[in-house]
Amino acid sequence: MTAPLVLAVPSKGRLQENAEAFFARAGLTLAKPRGVRDYRGTIAELDNVEIAYLSASEIASQLARGMVHLGVTGEDLIRESIVDADKRVALIDGLGFGSANVVVAVPQSWIDVRTMADLDDVTIGFRAQHNRRMRVATKYINLTRVFFASHGVVDYRIVESAGATEGAPAVGTAEMIVDITTTGATLAANGLKVLDDGVILRSQANLVASRDADWSNGARETARIILDHIAARARANQYREVRTRFTGCDTTLLAEAHDRFGVVSPFGGPTSSGMVTLHCPPDRLYALGSFLRQHGAETVSIASLDYVFDRENPLFVRLEAFLRP
């Protein structure tokens, strides 16, 4: 038996719950056969898969080392902890949870500082006045350096934060911060504001692939199946199934429906009796139903879709392209 594909997921909290729910919606049930406290698991519907429950930061590290094939972690951790990240890992799919921004935040009392250009002026003046560089508290050392350099800001020094970064200016350990935020409420509560152009990265949880993992034929096939489930669920979320039958339904009418409502005909045009199945974006359903009834349909039924499997899986195509020598 070949070595299993290793999929790393967060080991605790909301990220674990969201990751497990994401895979469950795709028809992949993450299970811990040896008990809830175990840090290894399986996918109930698949053989040749091992789930590794790790912290989000450990997942990024293990991806970089090639110790896991796929992992669920934030893009912020990937960009911060992996040098040349785009060469060593691939962001296969954004998962729609764990969203947060890495931002530059300064005291609200700095009323004349709104942009990185303003900050550059302030850091220069601060050094001239105090004979030392302005301090930036952060856990995101590499992201900070790259972003500040891209804006020409050089008169600062980083103070590595081990605790609540947003409190650093108030207690006097730094003049400003780079931190991650979801709503900005915590920053505001600590008297801080985000610079107008101070968003370093808009992050979310991603399914990430490691180039250096042992991508055997078995591992690739398992990855293909996992990604097929995910892509099918994502495509199903984009549409609702619309069915109707009436004699006035023809290819000309369907072409107009496509242009006006963004529908697709996954199984071709109407049958000789006018029976047709359409896939329609959710926000255009009522308009499409009205259109079809205006043209002769007596009944239009609408149903949710669980999965829509296409011949080509764009997620697996992305993985294969990344792994290609």
Swiss-Prot record:
**What's the chief localization of this chain?**
cytoplasm
Which UniProt keyword terms apply here? Amino-acid biosynthesis, ATP-binding, Cytoplasm, Glycosyltransferase, Histidine biosynthesis, Magnesium, Metal-binding, Nucleotide-binding, Transferase
A biological process term (GO) from this entry: L-histidine biosynthetic process
Please name the pathway.
Amino-acid biosynthesis; L-histidine biosynthesis; L-histidine from 5-phospho-alpha-D-ribose 1-diphosphate: step 1/9
Q: Which EC class heads this enzyme's classification?
A: transferase
- Subcellular location per the Swiss-Prot or TrEMBL entry: Cytoplasm
Q: Which GO terms describe its molecular function?
A: ATP binding; ATP phosphoribosyltransferase activity; magnesium ion binding
> Matching NCBIfam families, A to Z?
hisG (TIGR00070)
Q: Which family does it belong to?
A: Belongs to the ATP phosphoribosyltransferase family. Long subfamily.
**Role description:** Catalyzes the condensation of ATP and 5-phosphoribose 1-diphosphate to form N'-(5'-phosphoribosyl)-ATP (PR-ATP). Has a crucial role in the pathway because the rate of histidine biosynthesis seems to be controlled primarily by regulation of HisG enzymatic activity.
Protein name as annotated = ATP phosphoribosyltransferase
